[in-house]
Amino acid sequence: MIPLAIKIGITGPVGSIKSEALQKIIDMLKNDNLNVQGVLVSKVTNNGKLTGYTIEDIESKRKAQFCFDNFVSRVKIDKLGVDTKILEEILIPSLQKARETADVIVIDEIGKLENTTKKVHAEIEETLKCGKPLIVTLHKRSRNPVLQEIKSLEGVRVFDITPINKNILPFKVMHVLKGEE
């Protein structure tokens, strides 16, 4: 059983090591028969060029591209247009259900998502304040105030992932989640 209110932040450079570590943590939690819910964000590339992002509901596996290089929108992530309707259709019900039924909630790339729409911002804020164990990832150099907000939450631990510690970090996070550290 994981103590309530434990919040884990994983920061690191742009690249896949945060996602790889997060997926390993999710797999370890599921192997412990814990209900993990929330959202994962993945890059979409074409010939090595970033062309968008997808969002996936961890529990239902519902996945859609919400960010495109050729999509006209006032809302941007990394200069890519955001289809806020698609983002809200997956993120909002996923986080609402996670707050009700998950043992552990995950929000991947929280800094990118936080300021896309007022509804998304409100859902993320509500989820950050809920008493459930939470794991979030964000870019290390994010100037987004969400990093400071996460650091100020009660029971939070922030881990900086590097190529050197990427293999042991999931085990360290699991020890913290289980109250062993």
UniProtKB/Swiss-Prot annotation:
Catalysis performed (reactions): a ribonucleoside 5'-triphosphate + H2O = a ribonucleoside 5'-diphosphate + phosphate + H(+)
Secretion signal, residue range per the UniProt entry: none
Pfam hit, one: NTPase_1
Recorded superkingdom: Archaea
Residues holding ATP: 12-19, 104-111
GO molecular function: ATP binding; ribonucleoside triphosphate phosphatase activity
Record EC number: 3.6.1.15
Keywords: ATP-binding, Hydrolase, Nucleotide-binding
Top EC class of this enzyme: hydrolase
CDD domains: RecA-like_Thep1
The family this protein is said to belong to: Belongs to the THEP1 NTPase family.
Function field: Has nucleotide phosphatase activity towards ATP, GTP, CTP, TTP and UTP. May hydrolyze nucleoside diphosphates with lower efficiency.
Name of the protein in question: Nucleoside-triphosphatase THEP1
